[in-house]
A protein has these predicted regions:
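Context-gated lysine
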Residues: 2, 27-30, 53-54, 64, ...
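Core catalytic region of metal-dependent phosphoesterases/phosphodiesterases
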Residues: 2-95
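Catalytic phosphate/metal-binding cores of nucleic-acid and nucleotide-processing enzymes, i.e., regions
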Residues: 3, 17-21, 158-160, 170-182
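Conserved beta-sheet core of the metallophosphoesterase superfamily
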Residues: 84, 88, 96-101, 106-175
Length: 182
């Protein structure tokens, strides 16, 4: 199952539109959003073309609703303008024989406790792409669509058949690939 995974859009209409253009090209079975969808948060500068209403309208117009988890910048007011569930702190996806736990990252310890050995924990929050194995689990972060940190790219990630592929949201260029070993 091909999943398109992104995090930390933070209300950037420019980068949300770029992500949705990539989605047209990628044709995933599902778009997974790991939180911080509309609000930029008090610690972040305003992202390019900050327009929460436009961002919400683009996401609401999707033919298939994205699967989302709540980020630390997401709240009940955001849910009032989005037509798909946003307020779950955790979710799980079963794909290609793997269990993928979804969380934003500010509750990463709780998600780690729920994961069985060999499971994959997907998280955002740090705005920094990551792929690491610890305590028998994989921890994978797509980075940020709109406000990347530590010199990383504006990015999203694909999952298909045990492989994660990171891509630049503006160009679609592949810049990292990692395989899960069972």
């Amino acid at each position: 199952m091909k999943l398109m995974i992104a995090s930390d859009l933070h209300g950037s209409a420019y980068y949300t539109q770029a992500l949705l253009r990539r989605m047209e090209d990628e044709k995933p079975a599902k778009l997974v959003l790991l939180g911080d969808i509309l609000y930029h948060g008090p610690r972040n500068a305003l992202p390019r073309d900050y327009d929460t209403k436009k961002c919400a309208a683009m996401l609401n117009a999707l033919e298939k609703a994205p699967l989302c988890v709540r980020g630390n910048c997401d709240g009940e007011v955001d849910q009032m303008v989005l037509d798909f569930p946003l307020l779950a702190d955790f979710a799980a996806v079963f794909a290609d024989g793997y269990t993928l736990y979804l969380t934003h990252g500010h509750h990463l310890d709780e998600a780690s406790k729920a994961a069985a050995p060999g499971d994959i924990v997907l998280y955002g929050h740090t705005h920094v792409p990551a792929f690491e194995q610890k305590n028998g689990n994989y921890y994978v972060n797509p980075g940020s669509v709109s406000i990347p940190k530590e010199g990383s790219r504006h990015s999203y990630m694909l999952w298909e058949n045990g492989v994660f592929t990171w891509k630049d949201v503006e160009t679609g260029e592949i810049w990292r690939t990692e395989r899960i070993e069972k």
